[in-house]
Amino acid sequence: MAFRATSALRQSFKLRPAFELALRSSCLQLVLARWGLETAALMGVKGDRTANDDDRKVRAVEAIARAMYESGLDDHATEAEKAMLEKPYQCWEYEDYAYGDHWEAFGVLQWLLGRQHKIPPYYSNFDRARLFQGTGIMPADPSTVERFVDPFMASQTHQTLDVNQLQHEIDVSEAWLWRARAQVLLGLRKDLEMAEQQQPQQSATGIGEETPSETILRTKHIPHSLRRMARDMPKTIPVAATQARDKGLVDALEGNDFAIAVELKGNGTDNATASSAASTTTNVPYANLDSNHQDAIRKIAESRFFAFAWAVSKANKWNPDTVSELVSINPISSVWTA
């Protein structure tokens, strides 16, 4: 039976100052703007592409980098972010493209600042166009960065976010991250059990190379403290799902699992039937999703969770790669707090 803690173990969260959230949000927006240009080039989005189009994009890339320095954001951007913006157009490395996973963190920060009205379900993304519109920042224009950040710099500026609402959204992020990590462990439990049996032999022989399952756990940011739970996941997931539903952390269950709303494609022959069918959704259990969809939800959960963790200073520095060091933001994950 999974461990359950009382709500007395909760802590009162205090957000970082609004200007810190605004500065971090601005850094994310500049690099995500560059990410959009690089991703389009990588995917070969050409159309009626001309030499003038390439020149225009090169100028846009250079303008984004200048905006970072002229607005003073270079003092708040990470070294990795500055390095990405300084690279010439179409010279990004493979790992740079993973920055696209930060859209959801960008959305959470804007929600905390009151620029987004709600956080979408954890199987849906924030609307990216609305996120850019929410700040009013034109990535190549440093003055728009200042216009967004300056109102939050005043000493009397405070977030008006209700503390109970903040607590709820943190709890929701923890629940979905726990479920995403549980799915990774569920898929690897046999490999992990075998590795556990072989560990004494490896220690005796001095052989300690990373196994394929260990590589997956590392790249998918699974904390070491959770890995020993893999054997019990088939029994633990239904218990966690019921807990999450009863506490309002998920909207519904399907098959004793977190319910994922999936849109059904219509096969109607007439316009009325097709239109009606196109808007139909159904719930499926999380475990029944294919691996690509499960991975997409894991990335959404990780990104949002880390944004909350940083915003309440659970994470001291902005480095999403360290999310594997965090099991929860609360002292005990919200899934297991009564």
Q: Where are the model-predicted features located?
A:
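Extended, charge-rich alpha-helical interface modules
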Residues: A2-A338
